Amino acid sequence: MYDWLNALPKAELHLHLEGTLEPGLMFELARRNGVALPWPDVESLRRAYDYDNLQEFLDLYYRGAEVLRTEQDFYDLTWAYLLKCREQNVVHTEPFFDPQTHTDRGIAFETVLAGITQALEDGRTQLGIQGGLILSFLRHLPEEAAMRTLEQALPYRDAFIAVGLDSSERGFPPRLFQRVFERARAAGLPAVAHAGEEGPPEYIWEALDLLQVRRIDHGVRAAEDERLIERLIDTQIPLTVCPLSNTRLRVFDSMAEHNILELLERGVKVTVNSDDPAYFGGYITENFHALHEHLGMTQDQARRLAANSMDARLAGG
């Protein structure tokens, strides 16, 4: 079944480029840039990936991102992910990047963007992988910081297909960023947002009504609100679900408890994605395979999930 799932044409719609930083590449970039890591070797770093919640993961994630310094670093990071896309027949990808993670430590916005966009262009021409880039704001930072990032990005507006909202969810509801998303919408940028992962269903309502998102990233806690589920079915607003991430971060205690197939069978437009695959132990095929292994996902369900991902694209092609 793994090989069949791997060959299935897929789109990936919930993927953080910084979350594809594999331990080997992290050490390579650390050596290249003279960055001291707190782990003596790759295996020690792999053992450090034993965290219990979103915040512990984010602490490790931001520490790892410190090795990314130059345009070439961001190119290499993105290119490594695109090679994995080719390996797993991801024909379309719409990755996030978090500019604040880099600009707050002195890396120029233009440096980050240039490396990523060149790799994505090379992915189109050399690998045939289509897609587009999503500019994502860190919700644990103030609204003013997100607005500054948006203003930095607007001169390069054509480099982006949407804006997003990610990072620590609890205590940072979407309504805090309503003005930022209004400004982005005025510039012609559609929106997506992380909601309903650790946060309550109310955050999903806010993302829909206040941020006017076209997709909900995660969204699995929508199942706690029947009226919300009915709205998602009626509007066919997609959920970009990340099964391995959800179990790794204890959104569900085990994969056997995951609700993605229940949502699929009810008519919610759910999709399968890998989120931060270097940290969660698997790329998109591994996520599909986990659903087969633990939930008995059938080939028909896999085809429908893959078709949903193609239908839910924001970028053409």
Swiss-Prot record:
Its cofactor is Zn(2+). Its EC number is 3.5.4.2. It is an enzyme of class 3 (hydrolase). SUPFAM superfamilies: Metallo-dependent hydrolases. One of its GO terms (biological process) is hypoxanthine salvage. GO terms for molecular function: adenine deaminase activity; zinc ion binding. The record marks H218 as: Important for catalytic activity. Substrate binds at D276. InterPro entries: A_deaminase_dom (IPR001365), ADE (IPR028892), Ado/ade_deaminase (IPR006330), Metal_Hydrolase (IPR032466). GO terms for cellular component: cytosol. Belongs to the metallo-dependent hydrolases superfamily. Adenosine and AMP deaminases family. Adenine deaminase type 2 subfamily. Catalyzes the hydrolytic deamination of adenine to hypoxanthine. Plays an important role in the purine salvage pathway and in nitrogen catabolism. This is Adenine deaminase. It comes from Bordetella parapertussis (strain 12822 / ATCC BAA-587 / NCTC 13253).
